[in-house]
Amino acid sequence: MDDYSDPYYLPYSVVGNNFEIYYIPKAIDDYIELSQQICSEKKFNKKLFYCYQQLKLLPFWIKDELSIGDFIPPVVPCRDWGPKLHMYKGEWDKARDFILQCDKANAYYPNHGENELKELADFQYVAEIALSYISMHPGVLQKDIYTILNNQIPDINILKRFTRWSTQIRKEPYKRTNKLFVSN
């Protein structure tokens, strides 16, 4: 991956067909390639690695997008995946830093960065309650924890996301649900 810290050094890629040729800054070309890698990668750590690579290119891409139109595209892979992957791993400070870096690059619509920080705080709150309960009741059934914790959390959907994606818990299949344990 090239170093794009010098804004005056932006190598270009040539793309096009027989009728039109476009010169695309190499940073944008690399950004698009990383988007595909982020979206297709299944392993959390590798996906997160690609997110950090793309985060370095995000300011160039956002500037380019805003020069074309007045909006930020709805899908920005590193912005959409980076914080969530850290959340699923329980890395709250890293998730917060990732959100702040995306916000600094103007990758959010106004106030959406603040909304992401609130979502992070809500997810952390739910995760801490769920982890506490699971550690006191190892093997609790996934289907039961939703009912048990329903009155203690702001949004049941956050708990469902936590139990589905979190690497902080281990799931053992049991009948048509899972037994939940805190990961070591």
Spans of model-derived segments:
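Short helix-coil junctions and helix-kink-helix linkers
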Residues: 144-156
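Amphipathic alpha-helical repeat scaffolds of TPR domains
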Residues: 15-42, 49-59, 72-85, 128
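Short capping segments at the starts of secondary-structure elements
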Residues: 135-144
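TPR/TPR-like alpha-solenoid helical repeat scaffolds
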Residues: 66-82, 110-128
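Boundary/linker segments of alpha-helical solenoid repeat arrays
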Residues: 62-63, 104-116, 157-158
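Charged low-complexity interaction tracts in eukaryotic proteins
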Residues: 125-126, 157-184
